[in-house]
Swiss-Prot record:
This is Large ribosomal subunit protein uL13. Keywords: Ribonucleoprotein, Ribosomal protein. Part of the 50S ribosomal subunit. Belongs to the universal ribosomal protein uL13 family. GO terms for biological process: negative regulation of translation; translation. It comes from Bifidobacterium longum subsp. infantis (strain ATCC 15697 / DSM 20088 / JCM 1222 / NCTC 11817 / S12).
Length: 149
């Protein structure tokens, strides 16, 4: 059996918008990663760039379960003394986009295509986004956090 390779005409990049209000971080990240890779399409091929554009709004209202508020997110600049440690509680106030981008990045494959797919992810703190001319489809995540209820 031959490997299926989608034609360039089949490689359309649709736009989706996801509301992150009271959605658990891991559930949001897995759904976003599936959409970014294009696994929701019948023409999916792991080696082809068939992913979609994903817009996540209300990033500051995301739900973190367990003890993640005390957990830290590390990054290093590569320079001496360049280690940066931020707790999730600090990041939720200052930069909630970084929490979501890092979670989605961890769920994408570790290859060259992952950078292209991650560039199609756009995360916004509030409910407004500048991508209304693209007419994104609303993508509902069924399960919201039990803590929010």
């Amino acid at each position: 059996m031959k490997t299926f390779t989608p034609k360039p005409a089949d490689l359309t990049h649709d736009w989706y918008v996801i509301d992150a209000t009271d959605v658990v971080l891991g559930r949001l990240a897995t759904q976003a990663a599936v959409l970014l890779r294009g696994k929701n399409k019948p023409t999916y091929a792991p080696h082809a760039d068939s992913g979609n554009h994903v817009i996540i709004i209300n990033a500051d209202k995301i739900a973190l379960t367990g003890n993640k508020m005390g957990k830290e997110l590390y990054s290093h600049s590569g320079r001496p003394g360049g280690l940066r440690r931020d707790s999730y509680a600090e990041l939720l106030e200052k930069n909630p986009e970084r929490i979501i981008k890092n979670a989605v990045k961890g769920m994408l494959p570790k290859n060259r295509l992952a950078k292209v797919q991650l560039d199609r992810l756009r995360v916004f703190r509030g409910a407004e986004h500048p991508h209304t001319p693209q007419k994104p489809q609303v993508f509902e995540i069924a399960q919201v956090s039990q803590q929010a209820k």
